[in-house]
Amino acid sequence: MGRYSRDPENPAKSCKARGSNLRVHFKNTYETAMAIRKMPLRRAVRYLKNVTEKKECIPFRRFNGGVGRCAQAKQFGTTQGRWPKKSAEFPLQLLRNAESNADYKGLDVDRLVIDHIQVNRAPCLRRRTYRAHGRINPYMSSPCHIEVALSEREDAVSRAAPTDDAPAKKKLSKKKLARQKEKMMRE
């Protein structure tokens, strides 16, 4: 079993999945992972399916050099976006794997949220391409490692209603406290 970069806060209410040396572009997969971070599991699966069908785009924020603009990126507050099919399919498989792990653990699958997703560079694979005048250039690929951790969403705790017998005291600055003391001394 491999080591994950982050341990979940509540291991009993979370599940994990990972993939190593996946033959999919690192940069596109990084942007895909950042797009689905903190999403509920059901929404993330639906979103990645929509990306493969070009109904929703992946916003490109960090690795966006030369990336064209698309209207679908407006909903994410950016202008550049793409539909990286392979980079959407690999995390989708990992999410399904994590979902089956959660089902095996007896977690409520409908309440799962992507708590942690991380994409790291894997060692580059080297091939060659033949150029004019007998030269050879490298033809590299950039695979990646992906790890996902899902956790059950906690129920939001409502704030207690303020009681009338003890009004909340407002914190005063040092300057105002000094003025109040001065005023009390004069009286």
Curated annotation (Swiss-Prot):
NCBIfam families: uL22_arch_euk. The gene is RpL17. It holds the Pfam family Ribosomal_L22. Keywords: Ribonucleoprotein, Ribosomal protein. Residues 155-187 are annotated as: Disordered. Residues 169-178 have a biased composition (Basic residues). This is Large ribosomal subunit protein uL22. Coiled coil: none annotated. GO terms for molecular function: structural constituent of ribosome. It comes from Lonomia obliqua (Moth). GO terms for biological process: cytoplasmic translation. Belongs to the universal ribosomal protein uL22 family. CDD domains: Ribosomal_L22. GO terms for cellular component: cytosolic large ribosomal subunit.
